[in-house]
């Protein structure tokens, strides 16, 4: 989604350079990377959780190296002196992610920054089966107290405001304003799903899910009301989302990174692992040119 022409225009209206690796047939595209250039700086993405290269079929190590060398040469001819590539979580496509890392870090000598990313593989078993005992207990209690539902579009603003209020209570902020969020949803109405846990007294927890692809869901924003901190209803909310994802043949639920001021946010990472998430790397590659 993030590399689609529509989303690229939301990130920045102009300044995009797109490189493609063609297959044997003229119409075949084996890989593509969209890079935003402003002055002497180039970045992929301009404004999204990740950008980087999209690989549509298996590519040899040599072909991938040649492609990135072509990208570098093209950017340098246009006066680029700094390049940053924010890669997708390695868990999305482990083999391809390793290929990209080997080419950029080892062959082309990009500097590498590693973040910790957490994903939940979706399978036949319930998420509760993977949880630690303490989290299972929270899930059982929340199941008795709250009802799970998918929100109608008319509720989106209310859910956004709820999540924002929860973040404000914790002295945190959201990366997108409601205006920006609404604009993105209007362009991708089928990609956004809002879920909530609620009872007669109101909303206890909410989440905004992005369908990154047919096989991957990304929990973009989620939160629960501070008065439920001990109960942590987000645990039950996530297991409900897991069940919904399984019914739609989704393979991965991306819980995002667990970083705070460029360091691992250990309490957040512990929470994600305690509910059944698997930890992996998410790389950002940087290089300067003379």
What does each model-found stretch correspond to?
Residues 38-54:
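A short glycine/small-residue-enriched secondary-structure motif
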Residues 32, 65-70, 187-290:
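Aromatic (often tryptophan-rich) hydrophobic motifs at membrane interfaces
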Residues 57-62, 125-128:
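Short, polar/flexible loop-turn hinges at active-site or ligand-entry regions and domain interfaces
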Residues 1-42, 87-228:
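A conserved beta-strand-loop-helix scaffold within acyl/acetyltransferase catalytic domains
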Residues 68-75, 106:
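Short, charged beta->alpha transition segments
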Residues 61-62, 91-97, 260-264:
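Acidic-and-aromatic substrate-binding clefts and catalytic sites of carbohydrate-active enzymes
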Residues 63-71, 98, 178:
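Well-ordered, non-membrane alpha-helical segments in soluble/globular domains
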Residues 78-90, 246-257:
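Conserved GNAT acetyl-CoA-binding A-motif
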């Amino acid at each position: 989604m993030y590399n689609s022409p529509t989303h690229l225009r939301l990130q920045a209206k102009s300044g995009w350079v797109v490189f493609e690796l063609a297959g044997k047939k003229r119409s075949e595209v084996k890989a593509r990377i969209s890079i935003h250039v402003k002055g002497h700086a180039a970045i992929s993405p301009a404004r999204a959780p990740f950008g980087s290269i999209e690989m549509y079929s298996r590519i040899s190590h040599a072909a991938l190296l040649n492609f990135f060398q072509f990208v570098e040469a093209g950017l340098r001819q246009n006066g680029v002196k700094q390049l940053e590539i924010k890669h997708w979580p390695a868990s999305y496509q482990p083999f391809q992610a390793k290929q990209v890392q080997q080419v950029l870090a080892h062959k082309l000598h990009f500097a590498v920054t590693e973040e910790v990313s957490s994903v939940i593989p979706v399978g036949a078993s319930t998420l509760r089966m993977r949880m630690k005992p303490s989290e299972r207990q929270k899930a059982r209690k929340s199941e008795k107290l709250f009802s799970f539902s998918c929100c109608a579009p008319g509720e989106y603003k209310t859910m956004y405001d709820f999540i924002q209020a929860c973040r404000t209570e914790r002295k945190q902020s959201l990366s997108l304003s409601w205006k920006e969020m609404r604009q993105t949803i209007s362009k991708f109405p089928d990609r956004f799903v809002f879920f909530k846990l609620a009872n007669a007294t109101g909303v206890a927890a909410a989440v905004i899910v992005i369908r990154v692809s047919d096989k991957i869901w990304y929990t973009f924003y989620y939160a629960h009301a501070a008065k439920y901190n001990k109960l942590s209803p987000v645990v039950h909310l996530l297991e409900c989302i897991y069940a919904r994802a399984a019914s739609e043949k989704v393979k991965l639920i991306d819980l995002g990174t667990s970083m705070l001021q460029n360091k691992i946010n250990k309490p957040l990472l512990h929470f994600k692992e305690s509910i059944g998430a698997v930890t992996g790397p998410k790389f950002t590659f940087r290089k300067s040119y003379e």
